[in-house]
Amino acid sequence: MILNRLEVRGLRILRHVRMDPVSGLNLVHGVNGAGKTSLLEAIHLLSTGHSFRTRQLSPLLAPDCDAVEVVARIQSTGGGEPWPVGIRKTRDSTTARIRGENVRSLADLARLLPLQVMHPESHLLVSGGPGYRRAFLDWGCFHTDPAYHDHWRRYRHLLCQRNAALRDRSPARLLSAWDTALGEAGSALDLARATHLQTLLPYLDSLKQELPETSGLALEYRRGWNPEESLSESLAHSVQRDRSAGFTQVGPHRAELLCRLDGRPVAQVASRGQQKSVVLMLKMAQSLWLMETLGFPPVVLVDDLPAELDARHRGWLMNCLQGLGSQVFVTAIESDQVPLSGWDSWQMFHVEHGTLRVGD
């Protein structure tokens, strides 16, 4: 899917902006604070219901505005008639629409418009806590397994119920019932995550040859409980410890994707530049996999490309994105900081004081 029209109202400095993106590279340039990143936030909001910089609405609201609204037209990468999608967020409600109809879940928008995002905090995928890497695996599972989101929601609901039962000192009989249900839902998540990682490995091996500094990268998935036991068994065995702690200490919510470079944790031994190379490779591997699995690539957002990558890695990334066939939105202060060679479809946009115009 691609965007061929984007309209933003009330988001930070963007009071009302309209954009007609091309199907290839869309380069948005301008000085810091002009609204470049806000434009990418709007696209992310349209797909996921939140910004990649914050999940809070208040920082996004333009002065004297009580709502953020993003509407767009999307169409298949193969052509065909575009159709409208949109989202409106206030402090009290969120409304999303596809083809004029309200959607029951924001997951419907996310499935329609898969996004990969690279921004100044993307290094947290390898240097941050385990939650960042669980989210990486969950993204892939969500976009290829129609049941995954339901499993994930059920697991989160059951986990909250079990934690409440632990804090309330509920009898063992009730906890046992939660353990059985939680074990079933959690095992489904675990299987999907482990399977997704295995499908990514061939893509990662191929990309390692193009980025020599990542040749020693190895990934290991740890499920979050004793691999010799079922989840229900581990939950039963951890009841007393969980009662003392007041929360559940085993399960896929404690899973980890270990990233090692030459046998040592990437976060400990890799420079910030090496960490960015690993993140690039992980994101590109997942994008290539999505393309082959679904038949179309994700839309890719790259915020402040020149600040994030040196010239060699900028060239490598842009070549990869050309080959992938993604619609790409890139921000930069200066337009000449982004390589344009090889793009059949590209357009420059200049942002100044929250207004957008086409041109160099």
Swiss-Prot record:
GO molecular function terms noted in the UniProt entry: ATP binding; single-stranded DNA binding
NCBIfam families hit by this protein: recf (TIGR00611)
UniProt similarity note: Belongs to the RecF family.
Location, primary (coarse class): cytoplasm
Protein's name according to its UniProt entry: DNA replication and repair protein RecF
Source organism superkingdom: Bacteria
Keyword list, A-Z: ATP-binding, Cytoplasm, DNA damage, DNA repair, DNA replication, DNA-binding, Nucleotide-binding, SOS response
GO cellular component, one term: cytoplasm
PROSITE patterns membership: RECF_2
Subcellular location: Cytoplasm
Keyword DNA repair: yes
GO-annotated biological processes: DNA replication; DNA synthesis involved in DNA repair; double-strand break repair; SOS response
Free-text function comment from the UniProt entry: The RecF protein is involved in DNA metabolism; it is required for DNA replication and normal SOS inducibility. RecF binds preferentially to single-stranded, linear DNA. It also seems to bind ATP.
InterPro entries in UniProt: DNA-binding_RecF, DNA-binding_RecF_CS, P-loop_NTPase, RecF/RecN/SMC_N, RecF_2
Phylogenetic lineage: Bacteria, Pseudomonadati, Pseudomonadota, Gammaproteobacteria, Chromatiales
Organism: Thioalkalivibrio sulfidiphilus (strain HL-EbGR7)
Binding site for ATP: G30, V31, N32, G33, A34, G35, K36, T37
Coiled coil: none
